[in-house]
Amino acid sequence: DFKSGSTVCSDEEFANQQAHFQRFKAAVIYTPGDNEWTDCHRANNGSYDPLERLAALRQRFYTPGRSLGQNPLAVQNQSSQMPLYAGYIENQRWLHQEVMFATLHIVGSNNNLESRHLAAAAEFFARDAANVAWIEATFEQARARNAKAVVLAYTRRWPLMPLAYSCRSPRRCSIWPSTKRARCTKA
Protein backbone atom coordinates (compact mmCIF):
# COMPACT_ATOMS: atom_id res chain seq x y z
CA ASP A 1 0.00 0.00 0.00
CA PHE A 2 1.35 3.42 -0.87
CA LYS A 3 -1.36 5.23 1.13
CA SER A 4 -3.28 4.59 4.31
CA GLY A 5 -6.75 3.10 4.32
CA SER A 6 -8.26 6.40 5.41
CA THR A 7 -6.75 8.84 2.91
CA VAL A 8 -8.33 10.05 -0.32
CA CYS A 9 -7.80 8.00 -3.50
CA SER A 10 -7.43 11.07 -5.70
CA ASP A 11 -5.56 11.48 -8.97
CA GLU A 12 -3.38 13.98 -7.12
CA GLU A 13 -2.42 11.32 -4.55
CA PHE A 14 -1.64 8.87 -7.34
CA ALA A 15 0.51 11.48 -9.13
CA ASN A 16 2.40 12.25 -5.90
CA GLN A 17 3.11 8.56 -5.31
CA GLN A 18 4.20 8.00 -8.90
CA ALA A 19 6.60 10.96 -8.62
CA HIS A 20 7.92 9.47 -5.37
CA PHE A 21 8.59 6.11 -7.06
CA GLN A 22 10.33 7.86 -9.95
CA ARG A 23 12.77 9.57 -7.53
CA PHE A 24 14.32 6.21 -6.64
CA LYS A 25 17.68 5.81 -8.41
CA ALA A 26 17.17 2.05 -8.66
CA ALA A 27 14.29 0.14 -10.21
CA VAL A 28 10.98 0.04 -8.33
CA ILE A 29 8.53 -2.83 -8.68
CA TYR A 30 5.05 -1.87 -7.51
CA THR A 31 2.12 -4.20 -7.01
CA PRO A 32 -1.20 -2.63 -5.94
CA GLY A 33 -2.54 -2.86 -2.42
CA ASP A 34 -6.15 -2.67 -1.25
CA ASN A 35 -5.81 0.91 0.03
CA GLU A 36 -5.16 2.16 -3.50
CA TRP A 37 -8.38 0.88 -5.05
CA THR A 38 -10.63 -1.65 -3.25
CA ASP A 39 -11.07 0.64 -0.23
CA CYS A 40 -11.71 3.77 -2.31
CA HIS A 41 -15.52 3.44 -2.05
CA ARG A 42 -15.32 4.54 1.60
CA ALA A 43 -16.44 8.10 2.34
CA ASN A 44 -13.10 9.00 3.95
CA ASN A 45 -11.33 7.77 0.80
CA GLY A 46 -13.43 10.01 -1.46
CA SER A 47 -16.33 7.66 -2.34
CA TYR A 48 -14.68 6.62 -5.60
CA ASP A 49 -15.65 3.67 -7.78
CA PRO A 50 -13.00 1.04 -6.95
CA LEU A 51 -12.95 -0.32 -10.51
CA GLU A 52 -12.32 3.16 -11.89
CA ARG A 53 -9.44 3.58 -9.41
CA LEU A 54 -8.01 0.22 -10.49
CA ALA A 55 -8.07 1.36 -14.12
CA ALA A 56 -6.36 4.62 -13.10
CA LEU A 57 -3.62 2.69 -11.26
CA ARG A 58 -2.96 0.47 -14.25
CA GLN A 59 -2.76 3.45 -16.58
CA ARG A 60 -0.52 5.56 -14.34
CA PHE A 61 1.91 3.07 -12.80
CA TYR A 62 2.58 0.48 -15.49
CA THR A 63 4.45 0.60 -18.77
CA PRO A 64 4.79 -2.61 -20.79
CA GLY A 65 8.23 -4.14 -20.42
CA ARG A 66 9.68 -1.94 -17.69
CA SER A 67 9.44 -1.12 -14.01
CA LEU A 68 9.32 2.25 -12.30
CA GLY A 69 12.37 4.11 -10.99
CA GLN A 70 15.21 6.07 -12.58
CA ASN A 71 16.93 2.88 -13.76
CA PRO A 72 13.95 0.72 -14.70
CA LEU A 73 14.24 -3.02 -14.83
CA ALA A 74 13.16 -4.94 -17.91
CA VAL A 75 10.10 -6.99 -16.91
CA GLN A 76 7.57 -9.22 -18.58
CA ASN A 77 3.96 -8.15 -18.05
CA GLN A 78 1.13 -10.66 -18.11
CA SER A 79 -0.75 -8.31 -20.44
CA SER A 80 1.86 -8.74 -23.17
CA GLN A 81 2.84 -12.35 -22.47
CA MET A 82 -0.65 -13.85 -22.27
CA PRO A 83 -3.20 -12.28 -24.66
CA LEU A 84 -6.10 -13.94 -22.81
CA TYR A 85 -5.14 -11.77 -19.81
CA ALA A 86 -4.35 -8.55 -21.67
CA GLY A 87 -5.83 -6.38 -18.91
CA TYR A 88 -3.37 -7.45 -16.21
CA ILE A 89 -0.33 -5.25 -16.85
CA GLU A 90 0.37 -5.12 -13.10
CA ASN A 91 1.37 -8.80 -12.98
CA GLN A 92 5.09 -8.72 -13.76
CA ARG A 93 8.04 -11.09 -13.69
CA TRP A 94 11.78 -10.94 -14.14
CA LEU A 95 14.84 -13.13 -13.63
CA HIS A 96 17.62 -11.89 -11.36
CA GLN A 97 20.67 -13.95 -10.40
CA GLU A 98 18.94 -17.22 -11.31
CA VAL A 99 15.84 -16.39 -9.24
CA MET A 100 12.50 -15.85 -10.99
CA PHE A 101 10.46 -13.09 -9.36
CA ALA A 102 6.78 -12.45 -10.10
CA THR A 103 4.15 -10.09 -8.77
CA LEU A 104 0.55 -11.15 -8.28
CA HIS A 105 -2.40 -8.82 -7.86
CA ILE A 106 -3.88 -10.23 -4.65
CA VAL A 107 -5.02 -7.61 -2.14
CA GLY A 108 -6.70 -7.34 1.24
CA SER A 109 -10.25 -6.09 1.85
CA ASN A 110 -11.54 -9.47 0.73
CA ASN A 111 -9.57 -9.12 -2.53
CA ASN A 112 -12.51 -7.14 -3.99
CA LEU A 113 -14.87 -10.11 -3.74
CA GLU A 114 -17.92 -8.02 -2.87
CA SER A 115 -21.37 -9.58 -2.97
CA ARG A 116 -23.05 -6.16 -2.99
CA HIS A 117 -21.66 -5.36 -6.44
CA LEU A 118 -21.79 -7.85 -9.30
CA ALA A 119 -19.10 -5.94 -11.22
CA ALA A 120 -16.72 -6.27 -8.25
CA ALA A 121 -17.35 -10.00 -7.99
CA ALA A 122 -16.81 -10.41 -11.75
CA GLU A 123 -13.56 -8.44 -11.47
CA PHE A 124 -12.41 -10.65 -8.60
CA PHE A 125 -13.03 -13.92 -10.46
CA ALA A 126 -11.39 -12.67 -13.66
CA ARG A 127 -8.31 -11.39 -11.77
CA ASP A 128 -8.14 -14.58 -9.72
CA ALA A 129 -8.04 -16.64 -12.93
CA ALA A 130 -5.34 -14.33 -14.28
CA ASN A 131 -3.28 -14.77 -11.10
CA VAL A 132 -3.51 -18.57 -11.26
CA ALA A 133 -2.50 -18.54 -14.94
CA TRP A 134 0.40 -16.19 -14.14
CA ILE A 135 1.65 -18.45 -11.33
CA GLU A 136 1.56 -21.48 -13.61
CA ALA A 137 3.28 -19.60 -16.45
CA THR A 138 5.90 -18.25 -14.05
CA PHE A 139 6.82 -21.73 -12.84
CA GLU A 140 6.98 -22.94 -16.46
CA GLN A 141 9.23 -20.00 -17.34
CA ALA A 142 11.40 -20.67 -14.28
CA ARG A 143 11.87 -24.30 -15.31
CA ALA A 144 12.64 -23.31 -18.91
CA ARG A 145 15.25 -20.78 -17.74
CA ASN A 146 16.73 -23.09 -15.08
CA ALA A 147 15.90 -20.74 -12.23
CA LYS A 148 17.05 -21.94 -8.84
CA ALA A 149 14.06 -20.43 -7.03
CA VAL A 150 10.77 -18.60 -7.56
CA VAL A 151 9.62 -15.64 -5.45
CA LEU A 152 5.96 -14.59 -5.65
CA ALA A 153 5.20 -11.10 -4.33
CA TYR A 154 1.75 -9.79 -3.45
CA THR A 155 0.25 -7.45 -0.87
CA ARG A 156 -2.48 -9.48 0.81
CA ARG A 157 -1.30 -10.74 4.13
CA TRP A 158 -2.62 -14.34 4.16
CA PRO A 159 -4.04 -15.38 0.77
CA LEU A 160 -2.65 -18.91 1.04
CA MET A 161 -3.73 -19.64 4.61
CA PRO A 162 -4.10 -23.44 4.17
CA LEU A 163 -0.47 -23.50 3.03
CA ALA A 164 0.62 -21.85 6.28
CA TYR A 165 -0.80 -24.77 8.24
CA SER A 166 0.76 -27.45 6.08
CA CYS A 167 4.23 -25.86 6.03
CA ARG A 168 5.58 -25.22 9.47
CA SER A 169 9.02 -23.70 9.95
CA PRO A 170 11.82 -24.38 9.66
CA ARG A 171 10.89 -25.69 6.21
CA ARG A 172 11.10 -24.58 2.65
CA CYS A 173 7.92 -24.90 0.67
CA SER A 174 7.10 -24.96 -3.01
CA ILE A 175 3.64 -24.57 -4.45
CA TRP A 176 2.89 -26.61 -7.55
CA PRO A 177 0.11 -24.66 -9.30
CA SER A 178 -1.08 -27.56 -11.44
CA THR A 179 -1.95 -29.61 -8.34
CA LYS A 180 -2.40 -26.63 -5.95
CA ARG A 181 -0.41 -28.55 -3.34
CA ALA A 182 2.57 -27.56 -1.30
CA ARG A 183 5.70 -29.63 -1.11
CA CYS A 184 7.74 -28.92 2.00
CA THR A 185 11.23 -30.02 2.91
CA LYS A 186 13.28 -29.39 6.02
CA ALA A 187 15.40 -26.27 5.74
Labelled PLM ranges:
Residues 1-2, 34-35, 106-107, 155-157:
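Active-site metal-binding loops of divalent metal-dependent hydrolases
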Residues 1-12:
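N-terminal active-site segment of His-dependent metallophosphoesterases
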Residues 95, 101-102, 118-187:
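His/acidic metal-ligating clusters that form di-metal
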Residues 12-130:
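Extended active-site neighborhood of metal-dependent phosphoesterases/phosphodiesterases
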Residues 9, 42-43, 164-165:
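Short amphipathic alpha-helical segments
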Residues 4-5, 38-41, 161:
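A short acidic, helix-capping loop that chelates divalent metal ions and anchors anionic groups
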